[in-house]
């Protein structure tokens, strides 16, 4: 349970830090994840309220800088990532399988630094009102 809480706290801290940087930069200027990195992000379902993404990074794979709207994540595997933020700083995060996390939109470049593939499901909310319900 301690690892689960720690993983969620780390994930939310990264989301908050990159969300603050996004606000400082005056809004999203980078492409959203599916457009920027279709090799790792695929749309499984979409309607007027949410978009459900299936995400998979092989061991050692990394993305490009991209953005997310407010979202919740369900981690399907144990995973260890480095997240590079728009200002060039890097934040490490280790999250156990089964952890859940939600956060405001963010901009980052994730890299799977773990020895195994990392998989998760992300639910992106299309507007703040839906996310805040």
Describe the function of each predicted region.
Residues 1-4:
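Positively charged n-region of N-terminal signal peptides that target proteins for export
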Residues 8-17:
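Bacterial N-terminal signal peptides
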Residues 21-31:
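Cleaved targeting-peptide boundary
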Residues 37-64, 69-73, 123:
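A short glycine-rich, His/Asp/Glu-containing loop-to-beta-strand
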Residues 78, 105-128:
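Ligand-binding loop in jelly-roll beta-barrel domains
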Residues 88-105:
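Short acidic-glycine-tyrosine-enriched beta hairpin
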């Amino acid at each position: 349970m301690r690892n689960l809480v720690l993983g969620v706290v780390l994930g939310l801290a990264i989301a908050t830090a990159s969300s603050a940087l996004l606000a400082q930069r005056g809004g999203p200027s980078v492409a959203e994840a599916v457009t920027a990195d279709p090799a790792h992000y695929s749309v499984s379902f979409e309607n007027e309220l949410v978009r459900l993404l299936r995400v998979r990074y092989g061991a050692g794979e990394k993305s490009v800088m991209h953005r997310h709207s407010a979202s919740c994540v369900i981690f399907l595997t144990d995973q260890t990532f480095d997240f590079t933020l728009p200002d060039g700083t890097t934040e490490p995060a280790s999250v156990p399988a089964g952890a859940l996390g939600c956060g405001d939109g963010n901009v980052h470049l994730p890299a799977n630094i773990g020895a195994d593939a990392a998989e998760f499901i992300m639910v992106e909310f299309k507007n703040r009102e839906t996310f805040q319900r």
